[in-house]
Protein backbone atom coordinates (compact mmCIF):
# COMPACT_ATOMS: atom_id res chain seq x y z
CA UNK A 1 0.00 0.00 0.00
CA UNK A 2 1.35 3.43 -0.92
CA UNK A 3 1.48 6.04 1.81
CA UNK A 4 0.77 9.55 0.62
CA UNK A 5 1.90 12.62 2.49
CA UNK A 6 -1.52 14.12 1.72
CA UNK A 7 -3.62 11.56 3.62
CA UNK A 8 -1.24 10.54 6.34
CA UNK A 9 -2.15 11.87 9.84
CA UNK A 10 0.67 11.26 12.30
CA UNK A 11 -0.06 10.60 15.95
CA UNK A 12 1.31 13.42 18.07
CA UNK A 13 2.54 12.16 21.45
CA UNK A 14 1.42 13.99 24.60
CA UNK A 15 3.85 15.98 26.69
CA UNK A 16 4.04 13.20 29.28
CA UNK A 17 3.98 10.09 27.17
CA UNK A 18 3.74 8.79 23.63
CA UNK A 19 0.74 6.61 22.84
CA UNK A 20 0.85 3.88 25.44
CA UNK A 21 -0.74 0.46 25.22
CA UNK A 22 -2.10 0.19 28.75
CA UNK A 23 -2.28 -3.61 28.91
CA UNK A 24 1.06 -4.61 27.41
CA UNK A 25 3.15 -1.48 27.87
CA UNK A 26 4.15 -1.49 24.18
CA UNK A 27 4.90 1.86 22.58
CA UNK A 28 3.02 2.30 19.31
CA UNK A 29 5.26 3.07 16.33
CA UNK A 30 3.88 5.43 13.67
CA UNK A 31 2.94 3.52 10.48
CA UNK A 32 5.38 5.45 8.24
CA UNK A 33 8.27 4.69 10.59
CA UNK A 34 7.47 0.97 10.61
CA UNK A 35 7.36 0.90 6.79
CA UNK A 36 10.74 2.65 6.60
CA UNK A 37 12.16 0.24 9.14
CA UNK A 38 10.87 -2.64 7.03
CA UNK A 39 12.52 -1.24 3.91
CA UNK A 40 15.82 -0.74 5.70
CA UNK A 41 15.54 -4.21 7.17
CA UNK A 42 14.97 -5.83 3.78
CA UNK A 43 17.89 -3.90 2.29
CA UNK A 44 20.09 -5.02 5.16
CA UNK A 45 18.96 -8.60 4.63
CA UNK A 46 19.84 -8.41 0.94
CA UNK A 47 23.28 -7.03 1.76
CA UNK A 48 23.86 -9.75 4.34
CA UNK A 49 22.65 -12.38 1.88
CA UNK A 50 25.01 -11.05 -0.83
CA UNK A 51 27.92 -10.98 1.60
CA UNK A 52 27.20 -14.56 2.64
CA UNK A 53 27.05 -15.68 -1.00
CA UNK A 54 30.36 -13.93 -1.73
CA UNK A 55 31.97 -15.53 1.31
CA UNK A 56 30.71 -18.97 0.21
CA UNK A 57 32.10 -18.39 -3.29
CA UNK A 58 35.57 -17.56 -2.01
CA UNK A 59 35.45 -20.57 0.33
CA UNK A 60 34.58 -22.70 -2.69
CA UNK A 61 37.63 -21.34 -4.53
CA UNK A 62 39.88 -22.48 -1.68
CA UNK A 63 38.54 -26.01 -2.04
CA UNK A 64 38.34 -26.10 -5.85
CA UNK A 65 40.57 -28.69 -7.53
CA UNK A 66 42.86 -26.27 -9.35
CA UNK A 67 46.22 -26.79 -11.01
CA UNK A 68 48.27 -25.35 -13.84
CA UNK A 69 47.48 -27.23 -17.06
CA UNK A 70 49.63 -25.57 -19.72
CA UNK A 71 51.13 -22.33 -21.00
CA UNK A 72 50.16 -21.29 -24.51
CA UNK A 73 52.44 -19.30 -26.81
CA UNK A 74 53.22 -18.81 -30.49
CA UNK A 75 56.30 -19.96 -32.39
CA UNK A 76 57.57 -19.29 -35.91
CA UNK A 77 58.77 -22.81 -36.76
CA UNK A 78 56.97 -25.60 -34.93
CA UNK A 79 59.24 -28.47 -35.95
CA UNK A 80 62.39 -26.51 -35.09
CA UNK A 81 61.05 -25.63 -31.64
CA UNK A 82 59.93 -29.21 -30.97
CA UNK A 83 63.42 -30.43 -31.86
CA UNK A 84 65.04 -27.87 -29.54
CA UNK A 85 62.77 -28.73 -26.60
CA UNK A 86 63.18 -32.48 -26.97
CA UNK A 87 66.93 -32.54 -27.69
CA UNK A 88 68.13 -29.65 -25.51
CA UNK A 89 65.59 -29.51 -22.66
CA UNK A 90 64.65 -33.18 -22.50
CA UNK A 91 60.91 -32.67 -23.03
CA UNK A 92 58.64 -35.22 -24.69
CA UNK A 93 56.25 -34.52 -27.54
CA UNK A 94 52.88 -35.49 -26.03
CA UNK A 95 50.55 -34.70 -28.92
CA UNK A 96 50.44 -32.67 -32.09
CA UNK A 97 47.52 -31.56 -34.23
CA UNK A 98 46.95 -29.60 -37.42
CA UNK A 99 43.82 -27.49 -37.97
CA UNK A 100 44.04 -26.55 -41.67
CA UNK A 101 40.58 -24.95 -41.81
CA UNK A 102 41.76 -22.44 -39.21
CA UNK A 103 45.32 -22.29 -40.58
CA UNK A 104 47.25 -23.29 -37.49
CA UNK A 105 48.99 -26.24 -35.87
CA UNK A 106 49.91 -26.85 -32.27
CA UNK A 107 51.96 -29.24 -30.19
CA UNK A 108 51.97 -30.13 -26.51
CA UNK A 109 55.30 -30.90 -24.83
CA UNK A 110 56.36 -31.57 -21.27
CA UNK A 111 57.97 -33.99 -18.86
CA UNK A 112 54.96 -36.17 -18.08
CA UNK A 113 51.33 -36.91 -18.99
CA UNK A 114 49.03 -33.91 -19.40
CA UNK A 115 46.55 -35.28 -16.87
CA UNK A 116 49.08 -34.74 -14.07
CA UNK A 117 51.85 -32.46 -15.37
CA UNK A 118 52.22 -28.88 -16.52
CA UNK A 119 53.00 -28.62 -20.23
CA UNK A 120 53.62 -26.07 -22.97
CA UNK A 121 51.24 -25.66 -25.89
CA UNK A 122 53.09 -24.32 -28.92
CA UNK A 123 50.99 -22.68 -31.63
CA UNK A 124 52.15 -22.18 -35.20
CA UNK A 125 50.00 -19.91 -37.37
CA UNK A 126 50.42 -20.59 -41.08
CA UNK A 127 52.78 -18.13 -42.72
CA UNK A 128 53.85 -16.32 -39.53
CA UNK A 129 57.51 -16.97 -38.75
CA UNK A 130 58.29 -14.28 -36.17
CA UNK A 131 56.66 -12.85 -33.05
CA UNK A 132 57.31 -9.94 -30.72
CA UNK A 133 57.75 -11.28 -27.19
CA UNK A 134 57.70 -7.82 -25.61
CA UNK A 135 59.29 -7.01 -22.26
CA UNK A 136 56.57 -8.19 -19.87
CA UNK A 137 57.03 -11.93 -20.23
CA UNK A 138 59.84 -13.12 -17.99
CA UNK A 139 60.77 -16.76 -18.45
CA UNK A 140 59.88 -20.39 -17.95
CA UNK A 141 61.72 -22.37 -15.30
CA UNK A 142 63.02 -25.91 -15.86
CA UNK A 143 64.65 -28.12 -13.23
CA UNK A 144 67.86 -29.84 -14.38
CA UNK A 145 70.26 -32.16 -12.57
CA UNK A 146 73.39 -30.40 -13.86
CA UNK A 147 73.06 -26.83 -15.19
CA UNK A 148 76.59 -26.72 -16.64
CA UNK A 149 76.06 -29.96 -18.54
CA UNK A 150 72.70 -28.74 -19.85
CA UNK A 151 74.25 -25.47 -21.04
CA UNK A 152 77.07 -27.30 -22.83
CA UNK A 153 74.53 -29.40 -24.72
CA UNK A 154 72.52 -26.32 -25.67
CA UNK A 155 75.66 -24.65 -27.02
CA UNK A 156 76.47 -27.73 -29.11
CA UNK A 157 72.94 -27.67 -30.53
CA UNK A 158 73.30 -24.01 -31.48
CA UNK A 159 71.20 -22.58 -28.66
CA UNK A 160 71.76 -19.17 -27.13
CA UNK A 161 73.00 -18.86 -23.54
CA UNK A 162 72.18 -15.51 -21.92
CA UNK A 163 73.60 -16.29 -18.45
CA UNK A 164 76.26 -18.86 -17.71
CA UNK A 165 75.67 -21.31 -14.83
CA UNK A 166 76.36 -19.91 -11.37
CA UNK A 167 74.91 -19.72 -7.86
CA UNK A 168 72.10 -17.25 -7.22
CA UNK A 169 72.93 -14.28 -5.01
CA UNK A 170 72.47 -15.06 -1.30
CA UNK A 171 71.78 -18.70 -2.11
CA UNK A 172 73.31 -21.97 -3.23
CA UNK A 173 71.04 -22.91 -6.15
CA UNK A 174 72.93 -22.93 -9.45
CA UNK A 175 71.01 -21.38 -12.34
CA UNK A 176 71.56 -20.47 -15.97
CA UNK A 177 69.47 -18.68 -18.59
CA UNK A 178 69.03 -19.72 -22.22
CA UNK A 179 66.77 -18.75 -25.12
CA UNK A 180 64.78 -21.01 -27.41
CA UNK A 181 64.71 -20.44 -31.21
CA UNK A 182 61.97 -17.80 -30.87
CA UNK A 183 63.68 -15.88 -28.07
CA UNK A 184 61.59 -17.16 -25.14
CA UNK A 185 63.82 -17.31 -22.10
CA UNK A 186 64.24 -20.37 -19.89
CA UNK A 187 65.85 -20.45 -16.47
CA UNK A 188 67.63 -23.73 -15.78
CA UNK A 189 67.53 -24.48 -12.05
CA UNK A 190 69.89 -27.09 -10.65
CA UNK A 191 67.82 -29.01 -8.12
CA UNK A 192 67.10 -32.55 -7.05
CA UNK A 193 64.63 -34.77 -8.88
CA UNK A 194 61.08 -33.46 -8.97
CA UNK A 195 57.74 -34.66 -10.29
CA UNK A 196 57.27 -31.28 -12.03
CA UNK A 197 60.45 -30.25 -13.92
CA UNK A 198 58.60 -27.52 -15.85
CA UNK A 199 58.41 -25.64 -12.61
CA UNK A 200 57.87 -21.94 -13.20
CA UNK A 201 56.26 -19.19 -15.28
CA UNK A 202 57.53 -15.66 -14.64
CA UNK A 203 55.54 -12.53 -15.56
CA UNK A 204 56.13 -8.84 -14.82
CA UNK A 205 53.45 -6.78 -13.06
CA UNK A 206 53.03 -3.07 -12.42
CA UNK A 207 51.58 -3.30 -8.90
CA UNK A 208 52.71 -6.34 -6.94
CA UNK A 209 50.35 -5.93 -3.98
CA UNK A 210 47.36 -5.62 -6.30
CA UNK A 211 48.45 -8.67 -8.29
CA UNK A 212 49.03 -10.81 -5.19
CA UNK A 213 45.58 -10.01 -3.78
CA UNK A 214 43.94 -10.81 -7.13
CA UNK A 215 45.72 -14.15 -7.51
CA UNK A 216 44.94 -15.08 -3.93
CA UNK A 217 41.24 -14.18 -3.92
CA UNK A 218 40.09 -14.64 -7.51
CA UNK A 219 42.51 -17.33 -8.73
CA UNK A 220 42.83 -19.22 -5.45
CA UNK A 221 46.63 -19.33 -5.24
CA UNK A 222 48.75 -19.23 -2.12
CA UNK A 223 51.66 -16.84 -1.74
CA UNK A 224 54.61 -19.15 -1.14
CA UNK A 225 57.26 -16.49 -0.59
CA UNK A 226 58.08 -12.89 -1.38
CA UNK A 227 61.51 -11.34 -1.69
CA UNK A 228 62.74 -7.80 -2.21
CA UNK A 229 65.96 -7.46 -4.23
CA UNK A 230 67.25 -3.87 -3.89
CA UNK A 231 70.38 -4.54 -5.94
CA UNK A 232 68.30 -5.85 -8.86
CA UNK A 233 65.67 -3.17 -8.12
CA UNK A 234 62.79 -5.61 -8.06
CA UNK A 235 60.47 -7.52 -5.75
CA UNK A 236 59.33 -11.05 -6.55
CA UNK A 237 56.28 -12.92 -5.23
CA UNK A 238 56.01 -16.66 -5.86
CA UNK A 239 52.49 -18.07 -5.97
CA UNK A 240 50.94 -21.45 -6.63
CA UNK A 241 48.61 -24.27 -5.67
CA UNK A 242 51.05 -26.24 -3.57
CA UNK A 243 54.68 -26.60 -2.45
CA UNK A 244 57.23 -25.26 -4.91
CA UNK A 245 59.22 -28.51 -4.99
CA UNK A 246 56.21 -30.49 -6.28
CA UNK A 247 54.15 -27.99 -8.28
CA UNK A 248 54.54 -25.42 -11.01
CA UNK A 249 54.48 -21.89 -9.62
CA UNK A 250 53.79 -18.41 -10.94
CA UNK A 251 56.53 -15.86 -10.31
CA UNK A 252 55.28 -12.25 -10.31
CA UNK A 253 58.04 -9.64 -10.65
CA UNK A 254 57.68 -5.94 -9.88
CA UNK A 255 60.55 -3.85 -11.25
CA UNK A 256 60.94 -0.61 -9.28
CA UNK A 257 59.08 2.26 -10.90
CA UNK A 258 57.77 0.27 -13.89
CA UNK A 259 53.98 0.12 -14.07
CA UNK A 260 53.35 -0.85 -17.70
CA UNK A 261 54.83 -3.49 -19.99
CA UNK A 262 54.75 -4.33 -23.66
CA UNK A 263 53.25 -7.82 -23.84
CA UNK A 264 54.01 -8.33 -27.52
CA UNK A 265 52.08 -10.92 -29.51
CA UNK A 266 53.97 -14.12 -28.76
CA UNK A 267 53.05 -15.26 -25.26
CA UNK A 268 49.39 -16.23 -24.95
CA UNK A 269 48.06 -17.46 -21.63
CA UNK A 270 48.16 -19.92 -18.77
CA UNK A 271 45.39 -22.53 -18.61
CA UNK A 272 44.16 -23.54 -15.15
CA UNK A 273 41.94 -26.50 -14.32
CA UNK A 274 38.77 -25.95 -12.28
CA UNK A 275 35.68 -27.93 -11.29
CA UNK A 276 33.35 -25.09 -12.35
CA UNK A 277 34.18 -22.43 -14.95
CA UNK A 278 30.99 -20.50 -14.15
CA UNK A 279 31.83 -20.00 -10.47
CA UNK A 280 35.43 -19.22 -11.41
CA UNK A 281 34.29 -16.45 -13.75
CA UNK A 282 31.95 -15.05 -11.09
CA UNK A 283 34.80 -14.80 -8.58
CA UNK A 284 37.05 -13.09 -11.11
CA UNK A 285 34.43 -10.42 -11.77
CA UNK A 286 33.89 -9.86 -8.04
CA UNK A 287 37.62 -9.20 -7.70
CA UNK A 288 37.78 -6.70 -10.53
CA UNK A 289 39.08 -9.02 -13.23
CA UNK A 290 37.83 -8.73 -16.81
CA UNK A 291 36.07 -11.65 -18.50
CA UNK A 292 36.96 -11.68 -22.20
CA UNK A 293 35.26 -14.99 -22.98
CA UNK A 294 32.11 -15.85 -21.08
CA UNK A 295 32.06 -19.30 -19.48
CA UNK A 296 30.67 -22.04 -21.70
CA UNK A 297 31.56 -24.89 -24.06
CA UNK A 298 33.94 -24.48 -26.99
CA UNK A 299 32.35 -25.16 -30.38
CA UNK A 300 33.23 -28.58 -31.72
CA UNK A 301 34.85 -30.12 -28.64
CA UNK A 302 32.38 -28.94 -25.95
CA UNK A 303 35.12 -28.32 -23.38
CA UNK A 304 33.85 -25.62 -21.04
CA UNK A 305 36.22 -22.69 -20.55
CA UNK A 306 36.23 -19.10 -19.32
CA UNK A 307 38.94 -16.58 -20.20
CA UNK A 308 39.88 -13.49 -18.21
CA UNK A 309 42.51 -10.80 -17.85
CA UNK A 310 44.30 -10.13 -14.59
CA UNK A 311 44.79 -6.48 -13.42
CA UNK A 312 47.94 -6.21 -15.58
CA UNK A 313 46.28 -7.62 -18.69
CA UNK A 314 47.79 -11.12 -18.55
CA UNK A 315 45.41 -13.71 -19.91
CA UNK A 316 44.20 -16.72 -17.91
CA UNK A 317 41.96 -19.50 -19.22
CA UNK A 318 39.96 -21.67 -16.84
CA UNK A 319 39.22 -25.16 -18.18
CA UNK A 320 36.69 -27.63 -16.82
CA UNK A 321 38.66 -30.51 -15.27
CA UNK A 322 36.33 -33.30 -16.41
CA UNK A 323 36.11 -31.92 -19.95
CA UNK A 324 39.90 -31.59 -20.16
CA UNK A 325 40.38 -35.25 -19.23
CA UNK A 326 37.89 -36.26 -21.93
CA UNK A 327 40.03 -34.36 -24.46
CA UNK A 328 42.96 -36.59 -23.57
CA UNK A 329 41.09 -39.88 -24.07
Region locations from a protein language model:
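Vicinal oxygen chelate
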Residues: 2, 17-64, 97, 141-142, ...
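N-terminal secretory signal peptides
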Residues: 1-13
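Eukaryotic phosphotyrosine signaling hubs
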Residues: 68-70, 135-140, 198-200, 265-270
Amino acid sequence: MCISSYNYNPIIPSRRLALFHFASSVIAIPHSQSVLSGIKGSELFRVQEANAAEKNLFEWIKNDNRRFLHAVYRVGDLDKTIKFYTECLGMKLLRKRDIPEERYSNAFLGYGPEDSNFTVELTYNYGVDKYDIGNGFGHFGVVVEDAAKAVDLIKVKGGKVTKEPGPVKDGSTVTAFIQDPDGYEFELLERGLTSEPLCQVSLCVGDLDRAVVFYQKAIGMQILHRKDNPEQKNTVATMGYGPEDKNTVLELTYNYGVTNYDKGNGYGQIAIGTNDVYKSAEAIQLCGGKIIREPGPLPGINTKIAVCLDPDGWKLAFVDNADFLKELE
